[in-house]
Structure formats: structure tokens, C-alpha cells
């Protein structure tokens, strides 16, 4: 209430009033339904609802249509969008538009991050990405988020080219990362993909790999 009393911006106070008057409870009908389960998080870099296609992407289609899907949810296209949205998914914090928040605050520790939530429950946590540290300091960020082990394209031994458009294979990411965690009794693994990354105006090895299969699409 003090926040409302001290705020002079009417728009901000409209939001403040909305949130303060919400009926918040620590439990609902979904509380505990996944207790004791393992978790694999896949952050898909540079994709959209094109994959909601049963013919071409049956697994993703099944996950989207038979699981929980949140339509009124948006990833902000701000400064360094991948790193910032990755940070949001790990901490539930909104990132700052005028800086690469993940890199700017890479030395912070985040006890509330998703890795630490699972660490506190006795899980083995790990994270993986099929690219190098050119853009985001994941080697620092992920451990500070609580990831017990972070492995990039080199440690996963995934072939790749330093040419900008030659992104590594996400298929190999899954194949190389999975053995590191799948045999743990309780695990939480976080994978960030890269293959569909821009640019989209030039050919690339991964981009052309299945091109003939989509010849009927515009």
C-alpha cells in the first residue's frame, strides 16, 4: 500500500492496485502434481508457433497440444534477447531493455533461480548449449544460477564452424547432452538450442539439411 501512496504515475498505480487486490494463495489445483518428477527445460532459440504442426514436428506438437501451453506469454525483443529471456526463464525476473542484463549482472548469485530450487530438493542440475561463449557469459552465469555443471559446444564435442551462419546441430545437442544426466535418479537439465538462429537470408549447412522436405511450403 505504501507503494501506491508514493506513486504519482497513474498507469503504474493501476498495475499496483491490480496486483495488490489479487487473491493470491500458495496452493491451487495444480500444486504438487509434478512432485518427485525429473525436469528437462528446452529453451528454443529463434523459433515460433510454426512448429505446431503434427506432420513435420510430431513431438513438439504433442507437447504443445497435450501439455500446458500459455498463449498470453511473450518474450521481449530487447537487448540481447536470447540471454535476457534465458535469464527470465531461470529467475522469473524481467530484464532491463537498455542493457544485456544477463551479462551485466553475471557475477550476481541467484538463490531463487530454478537450478537452486531443484538443488535444495536434492536433484542433480546441469545446463547445456551448442555454441561458444562469444555472446553470453554462460560459463559464469549458469553456475551463479545454481547449475552444478555447464557444458558448451566444445565440451559436448559437437562439430561446428566459426562462420556466422554455420550454427551447430540441435539434434547433436540433445544426443550429446542427454547421457550426462539421464541416468541420475533425480535430475533437472536445461538445454538452450541454436540451430534456427538468424540470419535467414543466406544458406547454411543446417538450414539446407532438410530443405527438400519443405519444398511444398512457401
Q: Can you say where each PLM-predicted feature lies in the sequence?
A:
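Transmembrane and membrane-interface helices of multi-pass
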Residues: 1-2
Amino acid at each position: 500500500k505504501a507503494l501506491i501512496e508514493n506513486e504519482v504515475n497513474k498507469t503504474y498505480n493501476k498495475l499496483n492496485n491490480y496486483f495488490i487486490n489479487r487473491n493470491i494463495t500458495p496452493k491451487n489445483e495444480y500444486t504438487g502434481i509434478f512432485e518427485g518428477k525429473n525436469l528437462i527445460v528446452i529453451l528454443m532459440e529463434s523459433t515460433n508457433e510454426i512448429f505446431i504442426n503434427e506432420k513435420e514436428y510430431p513431438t513438439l506438437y504433442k507437447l504443445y497440444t497435450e501439455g500446458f501451453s500459455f498463449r498470453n506469454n511473450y518474450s521481449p525483443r530487447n537487448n540481447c534477447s536470447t540471454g535476457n529471456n534465458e535469464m527470465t526463464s531461470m529467475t522469473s525476473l524481467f530484464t532491463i531493455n537498455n542493457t544485456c542484463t544477463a551479462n551485466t549482472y553475471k557475477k550476481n548469485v541467484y538463490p531463487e533461480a530454478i537450478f537452486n530450487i531443484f538443488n535444495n530438493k536434492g536433484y542433480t542440475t546441469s545446463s547445456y548449449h551448442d555454441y561458444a561463449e562469444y555472446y553470453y557469459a554462460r560459463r559464469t552465469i549458469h553456475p551463479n544460477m545454481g547449475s552444478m555443471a555447464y557444458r558448451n559446444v566444445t565440451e559436448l564435442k559437437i562439430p561446428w564452424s566459426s562462420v556466422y551462419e554455420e550454427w551447430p546441430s540441435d539434434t547433436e545437442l540433445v544426443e550429446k547432452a542427454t547421457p550426462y544426466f539421464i541416468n541420475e535418479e533425480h535430475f533437472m537439465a536445461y538445454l538452450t538450442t541454436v540451430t534456427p538462429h538468424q540470419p535467414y537470408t543466406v544458406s547454411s549447412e543446417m538450414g539446407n539439411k532438410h530443405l527438400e522436405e519443405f519444398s511444398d511450403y512457401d
